């Protein structure tokens, strides 16, 4: 029951759509009508600029951190925290308040990892940041970040079956949601950060 409560609590926190709220408050626009149509960090950077994009990034990280800490404290369970983080990602990707049209959950995934096990989060963040810096492909960094997640859990949590299942599912879903980006990466048509081209 504690895991179910954690997921539900996380879901409602995840429905707090930072990009949507920031865009409405500052530019009076629906960010889903601009750029890629995504309510996430990358689209916020492209549509709203770096400062507001980073505000979105921090907000999406913090809601996952908050959910993990609340669940872990409330139920005295590290695993409950992971379930809450998963709930945030689900809520971010499919928020009922925006007719289930949200982002791709990468910033929230990072927040979940940093709160669940900072070692995994830090490595994932470093690898993703380096990839983005070298290639300017945010999608590549995002894919690497979520790929590292179950690998880190496998290494640091031997016997942690539920942890491995949860993080593997989240990674698979995140990669699937980047399928269009992967296609463009293969064709050499993917947008580079800081370069205006087609929407992603």
Model-derived segments and spans:
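C-terminal ends of transmembrane helices
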Residues: 19-22, 91-101, 128-135, 179-183
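Loop-to-transmembrane alpha-helix initiation sites
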Residues: 138-145, 159-170
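Short, non-helical or kinked segments that cap or interrupt transmembrane helices
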Residues: 29-40, 98-110, 137-145
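N-terminal signal-anchor transmembrane alpha helix
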Residues: 1-26
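Interfacial segments of multi-pass membrane proteins
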Residues: 45-48, 71-74, 91, 106-135, ...
């Amino acid at each position: 029951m504690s895991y179910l409560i954690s997921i539900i609590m996380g879901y409602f926190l995840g429905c707090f759509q930072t990009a949507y709220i920031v865009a409405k408050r500052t530019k009076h626009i629906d960010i889903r009508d601009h750029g890629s149509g995504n309510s996430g960090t990358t689209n916020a950077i492209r549509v709203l600029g770096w400062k507001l994009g980073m505000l979105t990034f921090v907000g999406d990280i913090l809601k996952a951190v908050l959910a993990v800490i609340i669940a872990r404290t409330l139920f005295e369970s590290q695993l409950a925290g992971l379930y809450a983080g998963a709930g945030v990602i689900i809520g971010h990707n499919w928020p009922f308040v925006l007719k289930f049209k949200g982002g791709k959950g990468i910033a929230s995934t990072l927040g979940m990892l940093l709160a669940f096990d900072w070692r995994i989060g830090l490595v994932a963040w470093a690898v993703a940041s380096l990839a983005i810096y070298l290639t300017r492909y945010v999608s590549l960094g995002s894919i690497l970040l979520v790929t590292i997640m179950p690998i880190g859990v496998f290494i640091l949590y031997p016997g942690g079956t539920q942890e491995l299942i949860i993080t593997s599912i989240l990674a698979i879903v995140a990669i699937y949601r980047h399928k269009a980006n992967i296609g463009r990466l293969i064709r050499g048509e993917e947008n580079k950060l800081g370069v205006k081209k087609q929407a992603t």
